[in-house]
């Protein structure tokens, strides 16, 4: 599955080495914070129920369908909490959101001047949607679509 990883023979490590290994793993895999870390032991035969539950949750999150009105309300809530930063004299204006696919879930946000939204705000929205709709254990893609202004003259379209 996309949201699961494993480490073998952890029980052979000392407590100190195991703790240092966990810290190093979290540091190096910071970009996978959305993935659950399940600790199992084949030797002690524990953790498998947690692992299977995590697999089921990741699968359910990857295929979850989220209605457009709920996504749009969540988008407005996210923007109300934290406005997109100004760029080029204006502020990007997200208008609505819909689900553009599943496995992994894709949330498509439509609006004006969205090409000016930076990576940090994209990560903020990803975290907000992930928490709001319980999308743990699966990657989440955010796409921005800006409608062209029909009143802006483009010399190339003559």
What label would you give each PLM region?
Residues 1-8:
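Short, small-residue-biased leader/transition segments that mark boundaries at the very start
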Residues 9-13, 42-48, 98-102, 113-116, ...:
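Conserved nucleotide-binding/hydrolysis micro-motifs of P-loop NTPases
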Residues 12-66:
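Canonical P-loop GTPase G-domain recognition
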Residues 25, 121-135:
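Short, non-transmembrane amphipathic alpha-helical segments
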Residues 32-36, 105, 136-140:
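Short glycine-/polar-rich loops that comprise or flank the Walker A/P-loop
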Residues 52-59, 65-117, 122-125:
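Long, well-ordered amphipathic alpha-helical subdomains in the mid-to-C-terminal portions
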Residues 91-93, 139-143:
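Residues at or immediately flanking beta-strands
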Residues 141-149, 158:
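Terminal-proximal interaction/regulatory segments of ATP-powered molecular machines
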């Amino acid at each position: 599955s996309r949201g699961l990883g494993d480490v073998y023979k952890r029980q052979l490590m000392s407590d100190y080495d195991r703790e240092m290994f966990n810290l190093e793993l979290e540091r190096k895999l910071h970009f996978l914070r959305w993935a659950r870390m399940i600790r199992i032991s084949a030797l002690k035969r524990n953790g498998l129920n947690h692992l299977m539950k995590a697999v089921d949750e990741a699968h359910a999150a990857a295929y979850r369908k989220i209605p457009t009105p709920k996504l749009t309300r969540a988008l407005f809530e996210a923007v109300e909490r934290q406005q997109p930063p100004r760029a080029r004299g204006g502020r990007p204006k997200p208008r609505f959101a819909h689900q553009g696919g599943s496995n992994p879930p894709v949330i498509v946000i439509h609006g004006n001047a969205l090409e000016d939204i930076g990576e940090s705000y994209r990560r903020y929205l990803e975290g907000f949607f992930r928490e709001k709709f319980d999308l743990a254990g699966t990657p989440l893609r955010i796409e921005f679509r800006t409608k062209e202004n029909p009143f802006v003259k483009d010399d190339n379209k003559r």
